[in-house]
Regions:
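N-terminal Rossmann-like NAD(P)+-binding subdomain of aldehyde/semialdehyde dehydrogenases
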Residues: 1-113
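Rossmann-like NAD(P) dinucleotide-binding subdomain of oxidoreductase/dehydrogenase enzymes
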Residues: 105-175
Length: 175
C-alpha cells in the first residue's frame, strides 16, 4: 500500500513539473520573440555549437545505450543532425515567407496565400533506435518554424537522454 501511495505522489509531482514547463513555454511563445528570423537563426547556431561541443559525449552515450561504434554514431546520428541544422539555418527565411497559391475559379477574383506561422508549443518524443537524431532534428525543425518545444527523450536510451538534456539546458536555459 505504501509503494502505491509513493508512486501516486511521484506521478502527481511529475505532472506538476510537466505543467510548469508547459506554462513557461507558452508564456515565452506569447512574448513573440520566436517570430523573428534572427532569433530562430541564433537559436539554431547555439544548438549546432552545443552539439559540436558534446559530439564525443553523444557518440559515447550511443555506444553505451545501443552498442553503436563512434563512426556509426557520428554518421547515422550526429553528422545527419548537424547537416539538417545547417540546412535549416540557410533556408529558414525562405521557409518562413508567405507564398502565393492558386485558387479555384469559383472563388474568382480572390487571391490565395499560404502564410507560414508557428503553432506555439510542440512536443518531440524520441524513440530508442535513433535517440539522438530523432530528438534533435525535430527540435531544430520546431525552432526553425518559430515554435517552442518540449523534448521527451527515450527512456530506453538513458545515457543519450542525459546528453540531450545537457545540450538542451546549455542552449536554452530556463527563464
Amino acid at each position: 500500500m505504501l509503494t502505491k501511495k509513493k508512486e501516486l505522489y511521484n506521478r502527481r509531482r511529475q505532472r506538476s513539473e510537466i505543467d510548469r514547463i508547459l506554462q513557461k513555454q507558452r508564456a515565452f511563445f506569447a512574448e513573440g520573440k520566436t517570430y523573428e528570423i534572427r532569433f530562430r537563426k541564433a537559436a539554431l547556431k547555439r544548438l549546432e555549437a552545443s552539439i559540436l561541443a558534446h559530439e564525443k559525449e553523444v557518440c559515447q552515450a550511443l555506444t553505451e545505450d545501443l552498442g553503436k561504434s563512434e563512426t556509426e554514431g557520428y554518421m547515422c546520428e550526429v553528422g545527419l543532425t548537424l547537416a539538417e541544422i545547417r540546412g535549416l539555418y540557410r533556408n529558414v527565411k525562405a521557409y518562413s515567407k508567405t507564398k502565393r497559391v492558386p485558387v479555384s475559379m469559383a472563388n474568382f477574383p480572390a487571391k490565395g496565400y499560404l502564410v507560414q506561422e508557428p503553432y506555439g508549443v510542440t512536443l518531440v518524443m524520441s524513440p530508442w533506435n535513433y535517440p539522438f537524431m530523432l530528438a534533435m532534428e525535430p527540435l531544430a525543425g520546431a525552432i526553425a518554424a518559430g515554435n517552442c518545444c518540449v523534448v521527451k527523450p527515450s527512456a530506453y536510451a538513458p545515457a543519450t537522454s542525459a546528453v540531450i538534456a545537457a545540450i538542451v539546458k546549455e542552449c536554452f536555459p530556463e527563464g
